[in-house]
Amino acid sequence: MAKKSKIAKAKRQEKLVQQYAVKRAALKAKGDYIGLSKLPRDSSPVRLHHRDVLDGRPHAYMRKFGMSRLNFRELAHKGQIPGVRKASW
C-alpha cells in the first residue's frame, strides 16, 4: 500500500494535466517554449507515473489491467478478472 500522500499527489497531478492539456497543446503547436516553461511543472503528462488502482503501488504496473502484479496475481487466482485463466500446456 502506497502512502496516502503519494496517492493524493498523483490525483492532483492528473487534474493539473487535464486542466492544462488544451493550453499546453496550443503552446506546443505555436512553438512558444517560453510560455510552456511558465506552466506548472506538474501539468506535464511526462511527469505522471502509473499507479495501481487498488492500492496505489507504483512499481510492477500492468497497463492492460491497471494494477500491480501482486494484486493481479491475487485476483486472478480468485477468478475475479474476466478472461484470465491459469495457463496449462
Curated annotation (Swiss-Prot):
Pfam families referenced in this protein's UniProt entry, alphabetically: Ribosomal_S14 (PF00253)
Keywords (A to Z) from UniProt: Ribonucleoprotein, Ribosomal protein, RNA-binding, rRNA-binding
GO cellular component terms, semicolon-separated: cytoplasm; small ribosomal subunit
GO biological process, one term: translation
The keyword Transcription belongs to this UniProt entry's keyword annotation: no
GO molecular-function terms, A-Z: rRNA binding; structural constituent of ribosome
Role description: Binds 16S rRNA, required for the assembly of 30S particles and may also be responsible for determining the conformation of the 16S rRNA at the A site.
Family: Belongs to the universal ribosomal protein uS14 family.
Subunit organization: Part of the 30S ribosomal subunit. Contacts proteins S3 and S10.
PANTHER family assigned: 30S RIBOSOMAL PROTEIN S14, SMALL RIBOSOMAL SUBUNIT PROTEIN US14M
Protein name: Small ribosomal subunit protein uS14A
Source organism of this protein record: Lacticaseibacillus paracasei (strain ATCC 334 / BCRC 17002 / CCUG 31169 / CIP 107868 / KCTC 3260 / NRRL B-441) (Lactobacillus paracasei)
